[in-house]
Each structure stands twice: as C-alpha cells, then as structure tokens.
Amino acid sequence: MTDSIQSSITPVNIEEELKSSYLDYAMSVIVGRALPDVRDGLKPVHRRVLFSMDREGNTANKKYVKSARVVGDVIGKYHPHGDSAVYDTIVRMAQPFSLRYMLVDGQGNFGSIDGDAPAAMRYTEVRMQKITQALLTDLDKETVNFSPNYDGELMIPDVLPTRIPALLANGSSGIAVGMATNIPPHNLNEVLNGCLAYIDKNEITIDELMQHIPGPDFPTAALINGRKGIEEAYRTGRGKVYVRARATVETNEKGREQIIVSELPYQVNKAKLVEKIAELIREKKIEGISNITDLSNKEGIRIEIDIKRDAVGEVVLNHLYSLTQMQVTFGINMVALDHGQPRLFNLKEIIEAFVLHRREVVTRRSIFELRKARERTHILEGLAVARSNIDEMIAIIRNSKNREEAATSISSRSWTLHSDIINLLDASARPDELEENLGIQGEQYYLSPAQVNAILELRLHRLTGIAFEEVIKEYEELLVKIADLLHILSSAERLMEVIREELEEVKAQFGDDRLTEITAASGDIDLEDLIAQEDVVVTLSHEGYVKYQPLTDYEAQRRGGKGKSATKMKEEDFIEKLLVANTHDTILCFSSRGRLYWLKVYQLPQASRGARGRPIVNILPLQENERITAILPVSAYEEDKFVVMATAGGIVKKIALTEFSRPRSNGIIALNLRDEDELIGVDITDGSNEIMLFSSQGRVVRFAENAVRAMGRLATGVRGIKLALTNDISDDESAVEIEDISDDNAEASLDLNIDKVVSLVVPKGEGAILTATQNGYGKRTQLSEYPTKSRNTKGVISIKVSERNGKVVAATQVEETDQIMLITDAGTLVRTRVSEVSIVGRNTQGVRLIRTADDEHVVSLERVCDADEDDSLEESSSEE
C-alpha cells in the first residue's frame, strides 16, 4: 500500500460506524422516501413527479405524453432512483381504485383491481388531472422553499403550495425504519368543511370536527362497520376500522338466494378474494355455497355467490365476512413529517397543520404579488413621465450616441409629471428598495434605472403611442390591489378570509359525494373480547424493548438453578422491568421524566423467549431522552385506591388512582422530579397501608402510609428515607425527623451511585420480605422483623451488604406458596419456589438464589403468586 493511500485511511470503530451509518440511512428513508409531509400530503417521489409534469407543461389541458418520457425526466432531473419506482408511483396516482382523487390522468392499461400489472411505460400515456393543478397553484410566486436537486443544478420544492388537504383527501401509506404510516382517504367536501370549521373556531374539538368529517371515504366505496375505531384514530392518531364489502342477499329469477357483492374493501384484490372463497368451498370450510361467478366489467363490480337451498344467505354472508377479505381491518396510524420531523397526528392537528401551511403560502404569495404590483406601478409612473415629456424624451434618445448615453441623460435630470398621475401617487405603491432621492420629489420626478430601462425598451412608435388613459386605469387598478394585499398582510381576519374563499372555490370545483357508507356498530368486533384472559409475563429491557409471554412458558426450578433464557438480548442490553399481569389489564407506564402513559397488555407484542420484543418508543409517544422506568398493572380504577410512587432519591408521593383513569395519547405529568432523580417503583394502596423503602446499601425504612398525604399530579412529594452519603454502613438505627421536602436538611446532595432506593414495598398481610443482591444471593425475613419508624429516617438493616453479596437490587413481599423470578443483565431468568429460600433474621447475608457468571449480575426480582406445586416442574441442584 502506497504512502498516499495509507495517509488517507482513517481508522474508525466499526460498531460506532455501523450505528452512525444505519441512523443516517434510517433518517434518509424516513424523511426522503417513506413518510408524507403533513402540509401537502405527498412523499418526495410524488412531489417530484408532479413538479416535473408541471415544469414540462404536461397539464390537464394539453395532450397526453408517453409515461416513459415523464419517468425519464423525473429520474434524470429530480429523483435519481430506479425507473420502476417512479413508474409505479405514476401508475398508482392514475388508478381510480388506489387514490380517492386521482392526480394523474392515464391513457392505456394501468392495471386493475384484480392485481393485473400495468402495461410497460413505453405503451401508456399520462397528463395531470385538473385537480392536480390545485396542488401546484402559486408555485412560481415564492410561496414555498426550494432546495437543490441531487446534482445541485436544479431547484425542487420542499413542499407544494397545495390548496387541497391532500394528506386526508388521498391518505398515505409507507413503511420506514422503526415507524410506519397508514392514513385513509377522505371525502374532499367533508375535509374542506372541517378546515372551514377550524378557521371559524380554532378551539374546535375533535367531536365537533367529526360532525363535518364522519370518517374515511375509500375510492372503492364499501362499508365501515361502526364508529369506535374512527373516533379512537381521530383522537389519538391510531385506531382500527372494520371495512366490509357491500353485499346484499337477493332472490334470483329461479327463486334461489344469491349474495351480490358490488363493492370491495379498500386495497382488496378481487381475483384473490374470489379464489379464496372458491378454496374455502372446496375445503368445506364454508357450507351453503353452490357456485361463485365474477361478472365484473368496466361498469362496476358484481360477484354472484349462489346459496344452496338448505342454507341461509345471511348466515353464509357472516361466514364470508369472518373468513375472507370481504371484511378487513384498516389500521390507522397517522404519522407524517412536520417540518422534517416524524410525528403522530390526530385529526385536528392535521387540519391545523394544513391551515397553517395555507396561511404561510397566502402570506408569501401576497408579499410576492405586492412587490410585483409595486414594481409595475413604478414602471407605469416612468411611462407616464415619458408620455408627459414625449418631445424632450425623443430628442434625448435621438441625440445620444448609444443606449448608455441616453440612459445617463434621462436619469440625470428631473421631469415633470402629469397632474392626473401626481394626484394618484400613493406611498403604498413605492417599491421598498427604491432609493430615497428617486421618484416624486416635490413637483419633479426622478427616474430610476428600472424606469429608464423600460422606456428605452420601447420602440419609437410604441413610445409615442402610449395611451395616457390606459396608464391611469392600470395604475388605479394596481393601487386597489396593493391596498388589498397590504390589508391581507396586516389583518389576520382578512388573511383567513382569503384562505376561506380559496377553499370554498376548491370545494365548489372538485367536491363530490361520499362513497363509503358508515354503518351502525351492529356486529362490530370488540378487540378486547377476542383476547383470551390469561396471566402473562411482561418484560421491559434496559434498551426499551417490551413484550409479553404466557406465564406457562416458565417452569419452576429449585433455587440455585441455572435458569433459562427469558429473552434474546444485545450484548449491552438486559431486562430491567418484569411483572406478571393479565392480558386485559392496563399497564401504567411511568417515565424517567415523571410522565405517565397507558397501554393495554394485549397491545404489547407477544413474543417467544428468544425474541427481543418491540421498542417501546414505537408504541408510546416518548419525548427525546425519555425512557420508561416503572410499570404497574391495573385492572380497575377504584375511588378508594391510591398510587404510591418512590424515587431513587428517596422521595415518596401518594396520589388518588382515579387521577390516572383518563388515558391520554400523549401522556400526563404524574410526578415532578428533581435534578437527576428518577422513579423506581409504584404500587396501589387503600390509604391505610404501610410503606417500605429498601436501599441499595441494605437498609429499609417502614412507615405508615398516612404519614404521606395525597397530592396533586404536579406535586413533588416528600422525603421517605434518609440515604447514606458514604459507602460506610452504620448499624445506627436512630431516627432524624425531616418533615417536608422543602426543609433545608432535605436539600443535601445525594450520590445515587453510593446509595439509592431500589424497591418500594407496600406490605399486605403478614408474610415475609425476600431480598436479592447483585451477586445472586438473598434471603427471606418475616415482616415482623422490620420495625415501623417515622418516614425520613435511616431505617434499619435489611440484609448485610458484603463483597460476596454485592449491593441490594430489589426486595419484594412473598408468601410460602409463591414463586419468584430473578433476571440478570445477561438475559438469564430463573424461577424458583419461595419455600426453598431460608427464613433468617434481618442482619444476615442470606443464601444463593441464582448462580451467576463472574461478570453477570442480578438486575430484577419479581414475585409470582399461587405457584402450581406440580411434581413435574423442572428441578436443578441447589447450593448455598
């Protein structure tokens, strides 16, 4: 290798390079390919195709051009990717069954609802639809920003100045890296009515918006069964709607029942549907059908399903809905780019983003038109000067040797201006950039270079033929226009009035009737009713991967067993939170920033032990650098129950459970955290319980719950335990009272690396406390061994912290018949019977609970109630 090559090589860490490069790739896919912009509803490839067709004059009033020509123009100038990707985009924009409002007018074979492929691009021809021009209007009036194309030679718009809320009108779908979008199409009349309602009342609610926009409107029509999923999607940005084929049971001329299918759910392949029904008939999975015939033609869809004499048509139809794509679930996930950042939008936010875009477009257009109008009035003033002094002007031009000399002579002197023009002159018409010494000065007029150039551009016969009346008329019209533009720019009311007028024009020109019928929720499928109730293990990893597995996946082992893998982890990842819940429970997810989010257990991904699950950031709308630090299962929100929260810094807070009974898509503030503190535990109480806080230095404080008053959501809480400031563990169990977090003593700085709260326990009944340490040791100690103290004391020793044990990682209350689960940072999980763990005093080291490798540590402990004492449970040797 030569020295020059060697000197140009820079060593990099391959792991960091892979992370960085993959992140760059992911953002490129998200921003540059897969997600639409919330403002114009288009992905980059759609925007570039339409922009190219507009630049080439391939508009609705021109003749068709070959698709190959458009594709070549797009990939050559704006979109340096494969021609098939661009042609597929053009094809989809020309298919009446794909887009609610087609943007491309195609001539030739563009495929069919049966899944037939379109003809090659050399055979088909295209031009823009009339409605497409509404997306491109005012593009040349500096209404949007432009960016260089891939080679820097041309400029392409970042977004189109659309007058149509295309994201809702045509919807969008796409899969990016780590996120996806699926937005259904809507009726343009209804969406524009919603926009107009928002303009009239910015604080309009989503319920009020739904009076104008009742639901999606698919190009294939069909039926939407029920409104529940629509309402959820419009409120949260995510939801599911059930779309059914339009099918009726009729009696034919032979007196036999037939099911007539005339409309299909959106994106359902008709040929595959017919094939699937025929397959179900052959396999006898559907009874009562004697024949199926597809009689569809260019007039519309018609599938005839003949019913046997002894069958009931409605029953057969219900079977078809449940077993075929005659009923499908359309999962709504309204993710779009908001100025380059991916975001989940609800219905109102999408409309708001579109109206704000229109405000910017109209404002920028008005600024552009104002500048052009002022430039024109300025030129008209110059022409009026020339007309008023025509003889002198002609003499100067004739006596000048060249154009430059004439220009200098004309601009170096003052001129008189006709009194009719002087009376019309208005300061609002003066260009902003015009020098102060130019224009009207007293009764004299000084021409600018632009005016002189305009005069010299005229041929002599045109200069002498200037009609003074026409100049005055045009000047007056421009003054009226300038006044209106200034009014638009200075008045928010006038600006919104212009937006309203333009939206009403679009509605009058392109609005149409709804195609999709929204029916009552009869026969609506409740997803929760379809989910079997079972106990599951929910795990959340340090890297934020969440999943659940059936509890039966884990067999009990003797203590000291090696365990089995609970999940497949990356080298730097490990299970951080583990709990047992029912599939119908709600998981309250508390974040590192003190925010609370809601999830149903069945909404989590179900995965095997070997799978990592799904990143929780793809499920919850977490903010930047926010992570989930505590999770709590809730079956019902009872009025006499409370949620107790504890932080690593020793703060406790009590809040009524009903405060958390109204799930919000973006979460709420549950606890105001201080400094570097974070939430470590939550539990539900009845107001008369006791609270136990266990520290990593092996101490515990137990105090009455009524020592902590119920607080509001925004409160910080009070001090629960006095943590150690050094690694020296003292046996001093004396108490020092600190009444409130605001006391000066409570402000002492704490190092959570030295000591922190690791577990919150709300003891119930008698039982015992099982404590586990980093190195896999632990013990059981009767609850009666732990004395009740005041809150904010040092507490008492719960377990000896030693080199063998390591620090305490968790503690939990257990019963004799329970089992426990221990998880390590290597992803190993062991499940063992509590009865096999010895009961000893507080001030002891305990026994081995799980065998760990030298560099492996226990990170979590979870109790499993009512263990099955089946003798067949897997066993393994134990060792103390």
UniProtKB/Swiss-Prot annotation:
Heterotetramer, composed of two GyrA and two GyrB chains. In the heterotetramer, GyrA contains the active site tyrosine that forms a transient covalent intermediate with DNA, while GyrB binds cofactors and catalyzes ATP hydrolysis. Belongs to the type II topoisomerase GyrA/ParC subunit family. This is DNA gyrase subunit A. One of its GO terms (molecular function) is DNA binding. Residues 35-530 form the Topo IIA-type catalytic domain. Few gyrases are as efficient as E.coli at forming negative supercoils. Not all organisms have 2 type II topoisomerases; in organisms with a single type II topoisomerase this enzyme also has to decatenate newly replicated chromosomes. It is found in: Cytoplasm. It catalyses: ATP-dependent breakage, passage and rejoining of double-stranded DNA. One of its GO terms (biological process) is DNA-templated DNA replication. The keyword Cytoplasm applies.
